[in-house]
C-alpha cells in the first residue's frame, strides 16, 4: 500500500482524497476549539466570519472543509518534496498529514484548518530562510504569521519562543534579524490595539484574555485517549526509527526536523496549560506531528508494518 504513495501515482491522489473525507464519518461529539472560554476576541471574530464553514451546517460545508484539508496536505507535501526533506517523498507527507488528521478531534472545524495552514506556511518560510543571505522580508512575515496565531489565545504567545529558537537554529541570526522577527510578531497586536483604540473599545482583556488553567484530565473513553495518544507517540517513534537515516542527510534537512521537534514540544506545553481541553486544541499538534511521522514510512525494508499502521489508524478514525 505504501508503495503507491512513494511514487507520483494518480491512484495515490484518489486514496488521499478518500482519507480526507474520513472526518465526515467521525462519531466525535466533543467540544471544539471554537467553544473554548479563553479565546481572544480576534479569534472569535475570525471564527464568526468563517461560520459558514462550520461542519454543523451540513454536508456541503463538510465536503468543502475536506477539500481545504486535502489542499493543505498537498501544500505540506510540496514543501517537503521541494526542499528534499525526505528521500523519495512521493505523496508520503500528505499521507502522514491525512492519517493523523483523521484521528484528530473536530478535524473539520475552521479553527483547525486556519492554524494548520499558518503553521505550514511558517515552516516553509523557516526552511527557505536557511539559504537566504538576507532574509529580512521573510523574517518579518514569519514574525507576523506567528503573532497572528498568538493573538488567538494568550497561551499561544509561546509560539514566539519557538519562532525565535527556530530562526536561531536555521541560520546564523544577528540582533538585527531577531529584531525584525520581533517587529513582525508585534505587528498584529499593534493593529489590534489601534483598531480597538479608534473604536473606543480598548481593554487589556480584549488583547490578552486571561488564561483559564485547568489541569484536570478530560473525561474521554479509552478509545479516544488511544487515538489522541497517537498524535504524541507515532511522531516520537518515527524520529527514533528514522533517526539514523535523517542524521546522514544534509544540514538543512536535519535543522528542519529539529525546529519541527521544537514546535511539537511547544505545542505540547500549550496543551498542558489547557489539559482539561486537550481534545479541543489537539489540532495544534497536527502539522509538527505529520512532518515527524512522515519518515516512518520509509524506515522499513518491508512494508507490512507501515501498511498495518495505516489500516489501524483508519479503523481508529472510524470506530471512535
Per-region residue spans from a language model:
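Juxtamembrane membrane-water interface segments that cap and precede transmembrane helices
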Residues: 40-55, 204-225, 238-242
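Transmembrane-helix motifs of polytopic, lipid-linked glycan transferases
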Residues: 67-83
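Transmembrane-helix signature of polytopic, membrane-embedded enzymes
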Residues: 80-99, 117
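Aromatic- and kink-enriched transmembrane "portal" helix at the membrane-lumen/periplasm boundary
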Residues: 95-113
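Membrane-interface transmembrane helices that cradle and orient dolichyl/undecaprenyl
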Residues: 122-137
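Membrane-interface alpha helices of multi-pass inner-membrane proteins
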Residues: 138-152
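Perimembrane helix-loop-helix junctions
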Residues: 159-183
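Membrane-water interface signatures at transmembrane helix termini and the short loops
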Residues: 244-301
Amino acid at each position: 500500500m505504501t508503495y503507491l504513495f512513494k511514487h507520483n501515482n494518480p491512484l495515490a491522489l484518489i486514496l488521499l482524497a478518500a482519507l480526507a473525507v474520513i472526518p465526515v464519518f467521525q462519531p466525535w461529539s466533543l467540544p471544539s476549539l471554537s467553544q473554548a472560554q479563553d479565546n481572544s476576541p480576534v479569534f472569535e471574530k475570525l471564527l464568526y466570519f468563517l461560520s459558514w464553514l462550520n461542519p454543523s451546517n451540513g454536508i456541503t460545508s463538510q465536503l468543502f472543509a475536506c477539500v481545504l484539508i486535502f489542499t493543505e496536505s498537498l501544500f505540506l507535501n510540496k514543501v517537503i518534496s521541494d526542499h528534499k526533506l525526505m528521500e523519495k517523498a512521493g505523496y508520503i507527507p500528505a499521507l502522514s498529514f491525512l492519517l493523523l488528521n483523521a484521528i484528530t478531534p473536530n478535524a473539520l472545524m475552521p479553527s483547525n484548518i486556519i492554524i494548520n495552514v499558518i503553521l505550514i506556511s511558517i515552516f516553509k518560510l523557516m526552511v527557505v530562510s536557511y539559504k537566504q543571505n538576507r532574509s529580512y522580508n521573510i523574517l518579518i512575515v514569519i514574525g507576523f504569521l506567528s503573532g497572528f496565531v498568538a493573538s488567538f489565545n494568550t497561551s499561544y504567545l509561546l509560539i514566539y519562543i519557538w519562532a525565535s529558537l527556530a530562526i536561531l537554529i536555521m541560520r546564523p541570526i544577528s540582533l538585527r534579524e531577531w529584531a525584525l522577527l520581533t517587529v513582525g510578531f508585534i505587528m498584529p497586536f499593534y493593529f489590534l490595539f489601534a483598531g480597538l483604540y479608534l473604536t473606543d473599545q480598548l481593554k487589556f482583556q480584549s488583547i490578552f484574555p486571561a488564561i483559564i488553567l485547568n489541569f484536570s484530565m478530560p473525561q474521554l473513553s479509552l478509545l479516544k485517549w488511544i487515538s489522541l495518544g497517537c498524535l504524541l507517540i507515532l511522531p516520537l517513534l518515527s524520529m527514533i526509527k528514522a533517526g539514523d537515516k535523517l542524521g546522514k542527510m544534509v544540514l538543512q534537512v536535519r535543522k528542519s526536523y529539529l525546529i519541527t521537534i521544537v514546535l511539537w514540544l511547544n505545542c505540547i506545553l500549550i496543551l498542558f496549560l489547557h489539559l482539561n481541553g486537550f481534545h479541543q486544541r489537539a489540532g495544534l499538534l497536527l502539522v509538527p506531528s505529520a512532518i515527524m511521522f512522515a519518515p516512518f514510512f520509509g524506515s522499513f525494508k518491508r512494508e507490512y508494518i507501515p501498511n498495518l499502521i495505516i489500516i489501524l489508524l483508519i479503523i481508529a478514525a472510524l470506530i471512535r
